[in-house]
Amino acid sequence: MNARVGVFGGTFDPVHHAHLRMARAFADELALDEVRLIPAGQPYHRLEGPHASAAQRLDMVKLAIAADARLAVDEREIRRARPAYTVDTLRELRAELGDAAELWFLIGGDSLAALSSWKDWRKLFRLANLAVAMRPGFDPAALPPEVFQEWQARQVSDFSNRTASGTIRPLALPPLDLSATRLRARLAADEPVDGLIDPAVLAYIRRQRLYR
């Protein structure tokens, strides 16, 4: 059977339990062999950079996923010495995995609405399938016309014909109901974060004196 690989990118500043729940549900829903968490380098679309360094964010993801064999960390965007664009990351992964591998890129509904502003966005469909994490109230008809056209042409609801790339699959995943901003504020105020973050990650944050 061809490999089934998911891609879950984010700043992960810090990585927390909502990220992990979403990654595991992503793997479950699509019967993936592996989900690669890809910490962003310097995000080109954000004015404010990450609070923790690239190396620290990478360390935290490694600690958070250590007990789950289906989750892996991918360092390519951290190691890239230039802005990291999704199309470049997926192109590299496709070259490494081969044409037959089933590649899934996880995207939120808000990001999907802005997809046409991404670099070479139409090429994404040649490289991967898109898994859309649906939020309550998400309405595909409200997408920009060019994105909605792709939705209509590519959206699938079952796996009667799994393909290596080119489809859009809406998924009802656990919401990211914890923001990293709120978590950083709790850490800065020395408020309890039990159940919100992996204990090994919390110990690392305290050793490194992050988010003070």
Swiss-Prot record:
UniProt entry keywords in alphabetical sequence: ATP-binding, NAD, Nucleotide-binding, Nucleotidyltransferase, Pyridine nucleotide biosynthesis, Transferase
Record pathway: Cofactor biosynthesis; NAD(+) biosynthesis; deamido-NAD(+) from nicotinate D-ribonucleotide: step 1/1
BP GO annotations: NAD biosynthetic process
EC number(s) recorded for this UniProt protein: 2.7.7.18
Similarity annotation: Belongs to the NadD family.
Function (record text): Catalyzes the reversible adenylation of nicotinate mononucleotide (NaMN) to nicotinic acid adenine dinucleotide (NaAD).
Protein name per its UniProtKB record: Probable nicotinate-nucleotide adenylyltransferase
UniProt gene name: nadD
